[in-house]
Amino acid sequence: MEDGDFRRRPPLWTSYFSPEEVCFLTTVHTLASGSSGNALLLSCGESYILLDAGISCRRITAALRELGLELGSLTAILITHTHADHISGLQTLLKRCAAPVFTTERAARELSWRLPGAETRLDALDFGIPQSIGEFAVTAFPTSHDAPGSCGFRLDAAGGAVGVLTDTGYVTDEAADILEGVDLAVLEANHDIETLRSGPYPYYLKQRILGAQGHLSNEDAARFAAV
């Protein structure tokens, strides 16, 4: 596909928000987390962003209803990467709500191949360039993971700045720069290195998890969080 096959939104070049604009708090709800599925809901004002859809549409719907929301309340869907535990509910979700889907160009290409018809709903984000999505300015940054175009996100709104960094073998320089100064960071802490090495997983899986395109260890996550 050519670049024009995915819609691009104009960047938000401003320095975001003055103190006088703070009318709402940004909130983060974990709908699911772990190897069986991942999904977050971020909200500010009347904007609701679903970040990853790694559980069934039914579970997402039920979780939203517990918060007094419906699928139609969603402003947008953000996808970090195309592994099943982050997109397993996306195809059904696309049939049941009209929210646009934002991800990186390489991930968008993968989704368009794996999910027939999805290409008409995908918006490609460029790394490091903020995009205005509802109340949020969303900035994607690259992660080091074995999925095409994998990324994390910084979301700035009047109610605060949130960074989301999951599924990465290490914290890239771009990630560290973009996440500087956030009010809240949602950070992967996947494993204790020695417990993993001595555990029951097969050798190839241990090597994948420990590799540069695998998952962030508890030690590395703590080290980054302390900076």
Q: What are the roles of these predicted feature ranges?
A:
Residues E2-G4, R8-R9:
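Targeting/processing segments of secretory and organellar proteins
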Residues Y16, E20-L67, C151-D167, L184:
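Conserved beta-strand hairpin/beta-sheet module of binuclear metal-dependent hydrolase folds
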Residues L51-G54, L74-T82, F102-E105, G163-D167, ...:
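Active-site neighborhood of phospho(di)ester-bond hydrolases with catalytic His/Asp-centered motifs
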Residues L74, E119, V182-D183:
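Short, well-ordered alpha-helix to beta-strand connector turns
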Residues E105-G159:
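Metallo-beta-lactamase
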Residues D173-V227:
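Cap/insert and terminal regions of metallo-dependent hydrolase folds
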